[in-house]
Structure formats: C-alpha cells, structure tokens
C-alpha cells in the first residue's frame, strides 16, 4: 500500500505478503493433546527492509490427573523452532537465524470449597513450575503484559518468537 506520511517516494510503498497461521491437532496414542502449529510472514518496507519469519511449534498437554487428596495435576511440553531471514531490519538480526527452544511446565491446583448457610465459597490455590534450558530473546522493548489472565499460561509472554527462558 501507499504510505503518504513518508517523504522519500521510494519509501512510500510497503509490501506485506500474506501471512499464515496453521494449527493441527495430531493423532497420538498419548494421554493428552499433541498440536503442531506453523506461523509465518514476509514483509518488505522502507525500500530495502525485508523480514521473513517462519515459526514451528509442537506442543503437548497431558490430561488432568486427580490424586487421592484432590490435587489436579497436568504438564505441558513445548518445542519451538524460530527461523528468520532479514535484511536491514531493526527487529531481527540481519542474517539467517534459526533457534530451537523447549519448555516444560508442571501445573497443580487444589480446588477448595466452603459450604455455608447463606453462600458457598470457592478457592483454588495454583502451583506452576516451568523450566526452559534456553535463554529467551531480549524483548524488553516489546509491549507485553503479564496479568491474571495469562500468569499461569505456558506462553505468558504472548510471543510467537520466543519462550520464557530459565526456570520459574
């Protein structure tokens, strides 16, 4: 499209090729859900800035298991393959790049219920342990918010490019 705010006539045009996001639940003999996800795009803007991104995700989420005291446990495993090929980009390295990351997350919760005369109360303490042997990308300039909606999510950074590094 034509950006009329650009001064140089050669920078006025931006080419955004179709992006894609394909997800497929894979059949498996595992007790849980195995999902493959593929994301990609190609952008050409400011005359000579080219960004090509391809991300492959393979994730597994086990079914919940409830033990004798009522703890509900499950785990998640994510393998992420990030590939980029960029020229003159401020967002990515100006070369071909490939990065493989993995994340293991254990979730446990104990649903509690207090029955009273006038009302019932519910409380569910949640315990989450994560481990990623890789370090994550520097995304401090990204607009990411961790709040109560995604605090226990395996991808709480909401990033297609990286997983949260280290352990927590």
Name each model feature, range by range.
Residues 1-168:
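Outer-membrane beta-barrel proteins and related beta-barrel translocases across Gram-negative bacteria
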């Amino acid at each position: 499209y034509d950006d009329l705010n650009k001064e140089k006539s050669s920078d006025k045009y931006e080419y955004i090729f179709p992006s894609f996001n394909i997800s497929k639940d894979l059949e498996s003999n595992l007790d849980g859900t195995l999902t493959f996800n593929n994301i990609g795009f190609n952008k050409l803007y400011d005359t000579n800035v080219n960004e090509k991104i391809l991300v492959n995700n393979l994730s597994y989420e086990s079914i919940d298991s409830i033990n004798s005291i009522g703890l509900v446990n499950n785990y998640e495993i994510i393998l992420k393959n990030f590939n980029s090929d960029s020229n003159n980009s401020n967002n990515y390295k100006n070369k071909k790049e490939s990065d493989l990351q993995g994340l293991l997350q254990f979730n446990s919760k104990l649903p509690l219920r207090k029955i009273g005369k006038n009302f019932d109360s519910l409380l569910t303490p949640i315990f989450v342990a994560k481990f990623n042997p890789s370090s994550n990308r520097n995304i401090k300039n990204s607009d990411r918010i961790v709040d109560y909606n995604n605090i226990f999510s395996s991808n709480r950074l909401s990033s297609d490019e990286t997983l949260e590094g280290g352990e927590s």
